[in-house]
């Protein structure tokens, strides 16, 4: 799939701080496990092409909450960031703080099965992180949380994705059914103490555990396409918080 590079222009420089306006408190349950394939992404996700205009505006919600016409509202920037093009902090899955080294030996969840994680009160019966283990909830308050696998898939299936630049940072402008948009920067991921693929890929945790091995679901994208796939829990990834409508 051919994608044209686009330069994004920010509409505002509003700082992203915790705002609870318009947010509910109910957590969504997890549906059956399914992996998004490349063909599905190409069929249901509109990506920028040669007919797109040269410069696009990226809308930023004044309350730092963007209602894109989906099942949940999305934050305008990553957890720990003050602008939408910043990566914020990187987290291992089920952990609450950034760290200098991301590996299996110091991971709080990597070595455990989902059954064990339920017993340790890390996840619920739907394999979703409990609020006490959800970094977005702990950092921003009870109305915020990490997106589920289903919500990440909804973001892919129902939104228009356009690869380009915002303030010199590569990433995707994601526009919802109602025309509202967010920007997801391509800021890579941590393995060990090394940051990989910055400006090449975006790597975002969901709150949903994968039922095979030491993995959980993540929203990953490159210039080619976005997808939801399993990833080792010990790796450091960005988090884009959501809240209920």
Report each predicted region and the residues it spans.
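Hydrophobic single-pass membrane-insertion segments
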Residues: 26-27, 74
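Intrinsically disordered, low-complexity repeat and linker tracts
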Residues: 45-57
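Short, low-complexity, disordered segments immediately C-terminal to signal peptides
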Residues: 27-41
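Bacterial N-terminal signal peptides that target proteins for export
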Residues: 2-12
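C-terminal motif of bacterial Sec signal peptides marking the signal peptidase cleavage site
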Residues: 21-22
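Repetitive helical segments and hydrophobic/amphipathic motifs
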Residues: 16-18
